[in-house]
Amino acid sequence: MSYRKTVVSARRDQKKGRVGGLTEEQKQEIREAFDLFDTDGSGTIDAKELKVAMRALGFEPKKEEIKKMIADIDKAGSGTIDFEEFLQMMTSKMGERDSREEIIKAFKLFDDDNTGFITLKNLKRVAKELGENLTDEELQEMTDEADRNGDGQIDEDEFYRIMKKTSLF
């Protein structure tokens, strides 16, 4: 099995249990945050409440960002958003955050010696741990494909770029 197939397989397994890009647990967290800040029970939240709800979910939105988000999603122009609109917006936000975070976590797993780079040695170790019988030549090809600046190692940006290119994240 190739490295790409291994990553595809792992990614597929990870996606199981997700509905609409979010796990049921994440959807429940979003519902709880929305309900908590819909203090009047109207089924909608305004810009101020949106900011607080997003903070409760671990985001730090700026005032301008909040205004733009409401304008983008509040097609009726009411100045408020309902739960479905909030869920749609947070699904997108969490998806953006999750993919970057997942890729960085994966990078750190490869970079076990904390050099800030993935070397051929790191790649060999991971392949061995995964039970992949890859030759040095195959591992070198993988390194070469990701190594855009030609320094023989893969930095975080190069890793992020190659992972996004594979359409797995």
UniProtKB/Swiss-Prot annotation:
Annotated ranges, domain EF-hand: 25-60, 61-96, 98-133, 134-169
Top-level taxon of origin: Eukaryota
GO biological process, one term: cell division
Keyword entries, A-Z: Calcium, Cell cycle, Cell division, Metal-binding, Mitosis, Repeat
Positions contributing to Ca(2+) 2 binding: D147, N149, D151, Q153, E158
Positions contributing to Ca(2+) 1 binding: D38, D40, S42, T44, E49
Region Disordered, residue ranges: 1-24
A GO molecular function held by the record: calcium ion binding
InterPro entries, A to Z: CALM/Myosin/TropC-like, EF-hand-dom_pair, EF_Hand_1_Ca_BS, EF_hand_dom
Recorded family membership: Belongs to the centrin family.
Name of the protein: Caltractin
Originating organism: Dunaliella salina (Green alga)
